[in-house]
Every structure is written in structure tokens, then in C-alpha cells.
Amino acid sequence: MKYDMKQKLSRYSARKLLRAGWAARTLTATVMLMMAVVAPVNVSRGYAAAASDESLAAVVELADFSDGREAKAAGKRRERREQADVLAAQLLLRAREAEDGITAAMQQLETEGSYLEGLENRFKSADSLSGKILADADANLESLDTAAGAISDVLRYTLVVDEKSYADRVPKALHQLEASGFTVIKFRNAWGGKFYQGINAQLMSPEGVRVELQFHTAQSYAIKQVSHEVYEIRRNPKASEDERAEATRMSVVYNNHVIMPDGADKVTWEGKTGQAA
């Protein structure tokens, strides 16, 4: 029974044929070469047509295979995103359950010359949290569960401290939180580095919820807010090399304007200063 190629091809769009790409072109070229070398010079018109039909059928099969692989990959990406969304929702739910007590403890840190800033943004958004879980899992070659468990800023706070009392106030605030049942699990003093200027502490609340607390001056906080856009470009894997280079340059320019309080770069916690960058 003669192979009806026109009927076969009618079920496939030109788009599928094109997406077969290099493999399809290579296969077609190979078939044509074999015909030129092996077939008689006076090959019949019917035989030549049959060989051409067979090569086109192979192209169609390759197009189907390519579509199947792409659909499978897209399905896996969608499944991972859904898993990350669930983990993000669980982290936020737990944080919201403990938030009242944590916020109350942070508000106790407010004294003359120090105050909480950006309290309305204390929760990380669900989309941002889900994206961070995916990015950290890929970067560290770890499971989504492991990446989610390491996130420390589902709840985050910023204490702005007067420049004159900054070096003394930071350790006092941490001691005050420890007395309230918090544990300091990580301390990073970034004063004197090229980029971010300030002190970050990762805490574990009495309820077992990870919390981030940043210590800033009014000026360092303002510059952090202004430079946030270039910070996002620097860590965006989709940004071009030129875009990241320009964002890095602008970050250095911004942070060179920050005035460091006396003794801020010497502040430690249990003998550790963290690492400036």
C-alpha cells in the first residue's frame, strides 16, 4: 500500500517540522547522500518519491519526540514550582502564628534613639519566598525541603539606631532578645565592605521560628532602600553580564556614601564579627 505523505503531513504544523532542528536537517541530508551514492542514475520517479516520503516521516517523528521532551520538562518545572509554593505557604503560616509575640519582643527594643523601620513589610511575600526556595535549591544542589528549612527571613525586622550609640546599642539589643528566649544563630557585621553596610543577626524565636534582624543607621537604611533595585539585578541569573557589572558598580557607588558610626565595624557577638562584603 502506497504511503500517503500528504495525508500524514496534514496532521502536523510547519512549526513542529522547524523545531526538529539540527537532528532533522542532519537526517534529511544523510538520506539524500545515500540516495545519490547507492541509487541508480536512472532511478524511477516513484522510488525517489517513496524515499523522500520516508525521510519526511522521520522528521515528523523527531518533531513529536522534541515536543514530548519539552512537555515533560515543563511539567517538571511546574511541579517544582507547586512544591515550592506549598513550602512557602507552610513557612508563612507558621510565622504568622508566632508573629504577635515576636513583634512584641522587637518593639521592646525601641528606646530613645532607636526605632523599628518598615514594620509593615515584616513578612516576606509568598511569591518571593517561593522563588527563593527554588533558587537556593538549584544553587546549592539540595532538595526544596532543605532549602526551605534554611530560609531565615520569612519574618524580618529593621532596628534603626542613632549613630552615636550604635556600637553600644547593637549588643545590648541582642542580649535583651536572648533574655526574652531568642537565640542568636548567626551574626554578620558588614560594615566596611564594598556593598551592604549594616549588621544582620539571624535569630531563633522561642516558638522555633527563624527571624532576621538588621541594625542600621538612618542613612544606611535610606541608601539600602535606594539601592535595592541594583541589588536585585546583581542576584538575578537572567540579567546579562553587562547589566550585572553595571549594577555592581552602582552598588559600590551608593554604599561609598554611607557614613560608618564610630566603632561599628568592631561590633562582635561572642567573639564573631561575621564577614563584610
Q: What label would you give each PLM region?
A:
Residues 37-54:
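Signal peptide processing junction and immediate N-terminal pro/mature segment
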Residues 142-277:
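Long beta-strand-rich cores associated with HINT superfamily self-processing modules
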Residues 26-38:
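Bacterial N-terminal signal peptides
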Residues 51-140:
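Intrinsically disordered, low-complexity polar/charged tails and linkers
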Residues 1-20:
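N-terminal secretory signal peptides that target proteins for export/translocation
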Residues 2, 13, 25, 42-45, ...:
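Long, polar low-complexity intrinsically disordered regions
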Residues 2-4, 48-50, 92:
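Eukaryote-specific recognition of extended, low-complexity intrinsically disordered regions enriched
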